[in-house]
From Swiss-Prot:
The modification N-acetylserine is found at residue 2. Keywords: Acetylation, Nucleus, Phosphoprotein. This is Type 1 phosphatases regulator YPI1. It is found in: Nucleus. Present with 1080 molecules/cell in log phase SD medium. Residues 115-128 have a biased composition (Basic residues). GO terms for cellular component: nucleus; protein phosphatase type 1 complex. The keyword Cell division does not apply. The lineage of its organism: Eukaryota, Fungi, Dikarya, Ascomycota, Saccharomycotina. The modification Phosphoserine is found at residues 22, 133. Its main location: nucleus. It comes from the Eukaryota. Residues 1-21 have a biased composition (Polar residues). A motif (GLC7-binding) lies at residues 51-53.
Length: 155
């Protein structure tokens, strides 16, 4: 093929004799459209979202408390399904009494009232002042004993 070819960005120029021809490449565009397939039958789709445990999930001490290494949060579809009576944030040392008496008193409350009390307990717990103590990554190990033993070996 006679002439020079050189690529510049998205344009290609080809020189033929004394004439230059520029060809511009148009980028390809992929357009996705939803199909008009009918929805699946009711047998294929579950009516409620339930947690299903596989056989390899461990039963925690025969208490029917399933544990996995993956943390997931279940979001109920209806407000009726949010009837949850456990409080994982409760530390049992609240100022108004024991956690069991609080839980018993909260059984008669609606969802918003229980939520409000749970938030109040969480705020009380976070407001408690703890003395600062460095974690394991912030503490510089003491190597003086190790160095002393190494020095004794050399002598």
């Amino acid at each position: 093929m006679s002439g020079n070819q050189m690529a510049m960005g998205s344009e290609q120029q080809q020189t033929v004799g004394s004439r230059t021809v520029s060809v511009e490449e148009v980028p390809a565009v992929l357009q996705l459209r939803a199909t008009q397939d009918p929805p699946r039958s009711q047998e294929a789709m579950p009516t409620r979202h339930n947690v299903r445990w596989e056989e390899n999930v461990i039963d925690n001490e025969n208490m029917n408390k399933k544990k996995t290494k993956i943390c997931c949060i279940f979001h109920p579809q209806n407000e009726d399904e949010e009837e949850c009576n456990h409080h994982s944030d409760d530390d049992g040392s609240s100022s108004s009494g024991s956690s069991s008496s609080e839980s018993e008193n909260e059984k008669d409350l609606d969802f918003n009232e229980r939520r409000q009390r749970r938030l109040e307990r969480r705020h009380r717990k976070l407001e408690k002042k703890r003395s600062y103590s460095p974690n394991a990554y912030e503490i510089q190990p003491d190597y003086s004993e190790y160095r002393r033993k190494q020095q004794e070996k050399k002598d």
